[in-house]
Regions:
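Positively charged, small/polar-rich N-terminal and surface patches that mediate targeting and assembly
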Residues: 1-102
């Protein structure tokens, strides 16, 4: 069985409807020590929702944290996110610059 290092760095990907929401989420998760750092920026998103094609602007948020904090971070995002079904995707740091990881 694969052993998972709970201290492994991960980046959690989510989106927010606007800059203000992205900034609030970023500040709150860093303040709550659920993340070390967040980055966010605007993107154009094309998707299907409730049978209709949508073309919107939203903000991607990269949340840098550790594997052991993921479940608490996920709960926080679900509870406080303006979307009813936010994207919450964990991207493991399989390889990264060693000094940055620490």
């Amino acid at each position: 069985m694969l052993e998972i290092d709970e201290n492994m760095g991960i980046t959690v990907y989510t989106t927010a409807p606007d800059e203000k929401s992205a900034e609030e989420i970023a500040k709150q998760v860093v303040e709550a020590k659920l993340a070390a750092c967040c980055n966010f920026w605007p993107v154009r998103t094309i998707y299907s929702w409730e049978g209709k094609m949508k073309d919107d602007t939203e903000h991607v948020i990269f949340i840098k944290t550790s594997k052991k904090k993921f479940k608490d971070l996920e709960k926080y995002i679900v509870k406080n996110h303006p979307y009813s079904m936010p994207a919450i995707v964990s991207l493991p740091w399989d390889d990264s610059h060693e000094p940055y990881k620490n």
